Swiss-Prot record:
<dbReference type="Pfam" id="PF02696">
    <property type="entry name" value="SelO"/>
</dbReference>
<keyword id="KW-0464">Manganese</keyword>
<feature type="binding site">
    <location>
        <position position="88"/>
    </location>
    <ligand>
        <name>ATP</name>
    </ligand>
</feature>
<protein>
    <recommendedName>
        <fullName>Protein nucleotidyltransferase YdiU</fullName>
        <ecNumber>2.7.7.-</ecNumber>
        <ecNumber>2.7.7.108</ecNumber>
    </recommendedName>
</protein>
<keyword id="KW-0460">Magnesium</keyword>
<feature type="binding site">
    <location>
        <position position="172"/>
    </location>
    <ligand>
        <name>ATP</name>
    </ligand>
</feature>
<keyword id="KW-0479">Metal-binding</keyword>
<feature type="binding site">
    <location>
        <position position="245"/>
    </location>
    <ligand>
        <name>Mg(2+)</name>
    </ligand>
</feature>
<dbReference type="GO" id="GO:0070733">
    <property type="term" value="F:AMPylase activity"/>
</dbReference>
<feature type="binding site">
    <location>
        <position position="121"/>
    </location>
    <ligand>
        <name>ATP</name>
    </ligand>
</feature>
<feature type="active site" description="Proton acceptor">
    <location>
        <position position="244"/>
    </location>
</feature>
<comment type="function">
    <text>Nucleotidyltransferase involved in the post-translational modification of proteins. It can catalyze the addition of adenosine monophosphate (AMP) or uridine monophosphate (UMP) to a protein, resulting in modifications known as AMPylation and UMPylation.</text>
</comment>
<dbReference type="GO" id="GO:0000287">
    <property type="term" value="F:magnesium ion binding"/>
</dbReference>
<feature type="binding site">
    <location>
        <position position="179"/>
    </location>
    <ligand>
        <name>ATP</name>
    </ligand>
</feature>
<keyword id="KW-0067">ATP-binding</keyword>
<keyword id="KW-0808">Transferase</keyword>
<feature type="binding site">
    <location>
        <position position="122"/>
    </location>
    <ligand>
        <name>ATP</name>
    </ligand>
</feature>
Length: 472
């Protein structure tokens, strides 16, 4: 008996130019590593046996109603346009409407080659699968819009990268997999009919209140403003903010070389392929604006005379930096307990970040430490913090119940890079205890639990992760 998934597919009903129908490639010996029961319940999926789940989410069996396909898109990668990308190692099984009434994609990552694989094997190895499983679910628990992880399956096959590594498949759930790059490819090809169809589909699926292409542009802008400001507030560095990784739905998507900062610095980069620092922590807001400009460039092609809407489209894009700064300040004011807006708040936040960078302070523990009185301990030379703290306490005296605001704005736990790497190393050796412990701890990131106190600690000198890798 195959798994019962209540598919209700709409993307597969679009014209064939948007995708290639592609079944996942079966694997040798699928074994279920993890299954997200709460998410499955939300999706209306009744839990089968581990063997049934492994067969379906390993790609060996197609449930009734699945209509697997690989999506086509293009994208700017580190600022350079690639005219055709597409799902090179993933297939969209289909869509479901959850018990909350929201439509979501179910996609297998690492499911084998597709016509868009570009000489790749279409597979994923265990490390990136577990990284995305842990980090995407941690982001969800932090309240940040994100794709989610439904299942992880070991394939029983070896994937060859720098050496032989255990293969795995991730089941990713997303509001959709529409990207800025999905629009770019049809605009670049001059296929206005496809671009119009895609725009109408995106509006109907994500922003039904939006009026036309510029209404969609404005809605995507506002969603990205909230998303990127949320990233900044927890020290998250996406690492590869290419336009093919910029979600129309406003979700965090593609966790390849992502990282969370330990020691704060605005220029921090982890991704091994980001050699120029294009996607550094502090650059993320301006890259979001750049990506929106690429979407605007695509969408104005829907007009017979693009120049006629260029001014309005430009205004929508040019408003984004101020919106980002406002959203950023709102989130960081909350992190230091400020509800009421007052002159000097921007300077107060900026000064704290400046002395954190100078004092090599841990990002997460400093902000949480403002609540529990341990922030000073994070600084190599705390004298500058002492001066700032005096100013802050004076400002805080005008606030009502700042502790409650700070408690829900500053996580105790984040998926620290060294803990992720340790978990992956253990899992490759067959030990999943660290994975299960991380999943449990990070599901309640704002709770200070003694049994997880070790997960709060920054890395020791020999544990520091200097670079992260896509893992593809």
């Amino acid at each position: 008996m195959t798994l019962d998934i209540p598919f209700d597919n709409t993307y597969a009903q679009l014209a064939p130019e948007f995708y290639t129908r592609q079944a996942p490639t079966p694997v040798k010996a699928p074994r279920l590593l993890a299954f997200n029961d709460a998410l499955a319940t939300l999706l209306g999926i009744a839990r089968g046996t581990d063997a049934e789940l492994a067969q379906v989410f390993g790609g060996n069996e197609l449930p009734e109603g699945a209509d697997p396909l690989a999506q086509l898109y293009a994208g700017h990668q580190f600022g350079t346009y690639n005219p055709q990308l597409g799902d090179g190692r993933a297939v969209l099984l289909g869509e479901v409407v959850g018990t909350d009434g929201l439509r979501r994609d179910i996609q297998l990552k690492g499911s084998g080659p597709t016509p868009y694989s570009r000489r790749g094997d279409g597979r994923a190895w265990l490390g990136p699968v577990l990284r995305e499983y842990v980090v995407s679910e941690a982001m969800h628990a932090l309240g940040i819009p994100t794709t989610r992880a439904l299942a992880a399956v070991e394939t029983g096959e070896t994937v060859w990268r720098e050496g032989g590594l255990p293969g795995a498949v991730l089941t990713r759930v997303a509001s959709s997999h529409l990207r800025v790059g999905t629009f770019q490819i049809f605009a670049a090809r001059g296929n206005t009919e496809a671009l119009r169809s895609l725009t109408e589909y995106a509006i109907a699926r994500h922003y039904p209140e939006a009026k036309g292409a510029l209404g969609l542009l404005r809605a995507v802008r506002d969603a990205q403003v909230e998303l990127v400001s949320a990233w900044m507030s927890v020290g998250f560095i996406h690492g590869v903010m290419n336009t093919d990784n910029s979600s129309i739905a406003g979700e965090t998507i593609d966790y390849g070389p992502c990282a969370f900062m330990d020691v704060y610095h605005p220029n921090r980069v982890f991704s091994s392929i980001d050699r120029t620092g294009r996607y550094a922590y502090g650059n993320q807001p301006q890259i979001a604006v750049w990506n929106l400009a690429q979407l605007a460039t695509a969408l104005i092609q829907l007009e017979d005379d693009p120049e006629s809407v260029l001014e309005e489209a430009t205004e929508i894009v040019h408003a984004m930096p101020e919106l980002l700064e406002d959203a950023w300040l709102r989130r960081f004011r909350a992190k230091i307990g400020l509800r009421e807006v007052a002159e000097g708040d921007l300077e107060l936040v900026s000064d704290l970040l400046g002395i954190m960078a100078q004092g090599q302070a841990d990002f997460t523990n400093t902000f949480r430490g403002l609540l529990d009185g341990t922030a000073r301990d994070q600084f190599l030379e705390p004298e500058a913090f002492d001066v700032w703290e005096s100013r802050w306490k004076d400002r805080l005296s005008r606030e009502a119940d700042p502790e409650a605001l700070m408690a829900r704005s500053n996580p105790v736990l984040i998926p620290r890079n060294h803990r992720i790497e340790q978990m992956i190393a253990a899992a490759v050796g067959g030990d999943y205890a660290s994975f299960e412990r991380l999943m449990d701890a990070l599901s309640h990131p704002f709770e200070a639990r003694e049994d997880y106190a070790d997960l709060r600690r920054p890395p020791a000198e020999d544990e520091v992760v200097q670079a992260t890798f896509c893992g593809t």
